[in-house]
Curated annotation (Swiss-Prot):
InterPro entries: Ribosomal_uL16 (IPR047873), Ribosomal_uL16_bact-type (IPR000114), Ribosomal_uL16_CS (IPR020798), Ribosomal_uL16_dom (IPR016180), Ribosomal_uL16_sf (IPR036920). One of its GO terms (biological process) is translation. Keywords: Ribonucleoprotein, Ribosomal protein, RNA-binding, rRNA-binding, tRNA-binding. Binds 23S rRNA and is also seen to make contacts with the A and possibly P site tRNAs. Pfam families: Ribosomal_L16. Part of the 50S ribosomal subunit. Belongs to the universal ribosomal protein uL16 family. Signal peptide: none annotated. The gene is rplP. The keyword RNA-binding applies. Disulfide bonds: none annotated. One of its GO terms (molecular function) is structural constituent of ribosome. This is Large ribosomal subunit protein uL16.
Length: 136
């Protein structure tokens, strides 16, 4: 699963998921899966969606993952009293704003791409839409 090789700090503040997204255009492939809602994707969810897409296209074409989980999320163990410091890092997430392209695909027909992205979208906790590359 995806996670940073090394970080400057082990734990980070919770923060807020506001603002507008960068990476809103399909730039590598021909088709893309774009986030409509706001939320966060765990490394497990990103990988599950990638596997679903890879199986759907029967390993043909190329898939790009445009998001990376770079924020550590901590949890305290069960039945532990409050206080005594911040919990341990349990998983990594990517913060997603509306308009962000999550995945891109090329080398397959639009019908296959739509089907693959529909399977991937079912694995994700945020609302998404299918987009195609705009030619200038």
């Amino acid at each position: 699963m995806l996670q940073p090789k090394r970080t400057k700090f082990r734990k980070v503040h919770k923060g807020r998921n506001r603002g507008i997204a960068a990476g809103t255009e399909v730039s590598f492939g021909t088709f893309g899966l774009k986030a409509v809602g706001r939320g966060r994707l765990t490394a497990r969810q990103i990988e599950a969606a990638r596997r679903a897409m890879t199986r759907a296209v029967k390993r043909q074409g190329k898939i790009w993952i445009r998001v990376f989980p770079d924020k550590p999320i901590t949890e305290k163990p069960l039945e532990v009293r409050m206080g005594k410091g911040k919990g341990n890092v349990e998983y990594w997430v990517a913060l997603i704003q509306p308009g962000k392209v999550l995945y891109e695909m090329d080398g397959v027909s639009e019908e296959i791409a739509r089907n693959a992205f529909a399977l991937a979208a079912a694995k994700l906790p945020i609302k998404t839409t299918f987009v195609t590359k705009t030619v200038m």
